[in-house]
């Protein structure tokens, strides 16, 4: 018996669309630009599908087309596709610029929010009490330790990436263990980055593990 239980949220609907129309909707990597008016095509194709409502479908489509990986895929020379993956009209310069601006604003909002949350967390951390005068005096009476040996020269600090400026095919280094490893960015999301090492291995890492 076919499952007719309604899909509960946009994430489930997008996963269903990927399964139903694999030549159009992509689960990982850069998404394909969708045909203008594709919502109407979806509504017609899924008219008899009890699992999807038009309201939820519209919301899921909006989420899919505003995702970073979808906006990353809107480039010059790319053609929009229909539900069966057939190419149609090429993207216009206006649509490409709009996608770049939307991507930039979305990244700025996300990383500004993260910086604010980090500052608030630091402010909530209890401060260590200042040492009492008696303790300070006692410490000053202790014999001074012998001078330490000159420190060994340390390499220049690694430069952390600006997550808001990361883009596909950009060269970075991934901090794995003691030394960074060269890699190439393959996908950027709100939470992490997918990179490919020189060995061909694909990894998904957090922004704080990337350096230049």
Swiss-Prot record:
For this chain, one GO molecular function annotation is: RNA strand annealing activity
GO BP terms: post-transcriptional regulation of gene expression
Its subcellular locations are:
Cytoplasm
Q: Where is the composition biased (Basic and acidic residues)?
A: 102-124, 132-144
The Gene Ontology CC terms held by the record are: cytosol
Report the principal subcellular site: cytoplasm
Query: Which residues does the annotated region (Disordered) include?
Result: 102-149
The record's similarity note reads: Belongs to the ProQ family.
Name the record gives this protein: RNA chaperone ProQ
Q: What organism is listed for this UniProt entry?
A: Aeromonas hydrophila subsp. hydrophila (strain ATCC 7966 / DSM 30187 / BCRC 13018 / CCUG 14551 / JCM 1027 / KCTC 2358 / NCIMB 9240 / NCTC 8049)
Q: Which gene encodes it?
A: proQ
